[in-house]
């Protein structure tokens, strides 16, 4: 499994099928980049200059909304993930 370092988080992107109002399914080339995912792994947290570690706000299993162009896409074990900083998460869906 991927284990992120520092304040990084591994997200499994949730892709929704996009349809127009008339029911036409859009091809991948016409879809917007997804912004929702599920947290699958979290790093230990950010370390300040004085050595103090800042705790994480996100936990494994959280559904989150993140910045549109945030993170780095990686493929691991046949699945695609996004590794991003915790500050790129905009909201947690509860």
Curated annotation (Swiss-Prot):
Organism: Bacillus sp. (strain PS3)
Xref: CDD domains: cpn10
Function: Together with the chaperonin GroEL, plays an essential role in assisting protein folding. The GroEL-GroES system forms a nano-cage that allows encapsulation of the non-native substrate proteins and provides a physical environment optimized to promote and accelerate protein folding. GroES binds to the apical surface of the GroEL ring, thereby capping the opening of the GroEL channel.
Assembly behavior: Heptamer of 7 subunits arranged in a ring. Interacts with the chaperonin GroEL.
SMART domains noted in UniProt: Cpn10
Annotated HAMAP family: CH10
One Gene Ontology biological process: chaperone cofactor-dependent protein refolding
Top-level taxon in the UniProt lineage: Bacteria
PANTHER family: 10 KDA HEAT SHOCK PROTEIN, CO-CHAPERONIN GROES
Family membership noted in the UniProt record: Belongs to the GroES chaperonin family.
Protein keywords: Chaperone, Cytoplasm
One example GO MF annotation: metal ion binding
Cell compartments where the protein resides: Cytoplasm
Protein's name according to its UniProt entry: Co-chaperonin GroES
């Amino acid at each position: 499994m991927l284990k992120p370092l520092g304040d990084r988080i591994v997200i499994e992107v949730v892709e929704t099928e996009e349809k127009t109002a008339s029911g036409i399914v859009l091809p991948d080339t016409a879809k917007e980049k997804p912004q929702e995912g599920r947290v699958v792994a979290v790093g230990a947290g950010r370390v300040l200059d004085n050595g103090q570690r800042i705790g994480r706000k996100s936990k494994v299993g959280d559904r989150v909304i993140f910045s549109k162009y945030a993170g780095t896409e990686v493929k691991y074990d046949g699945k695609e993930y996004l590794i991003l900083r915790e500050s790129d998460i905009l909201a947690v869906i509860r």
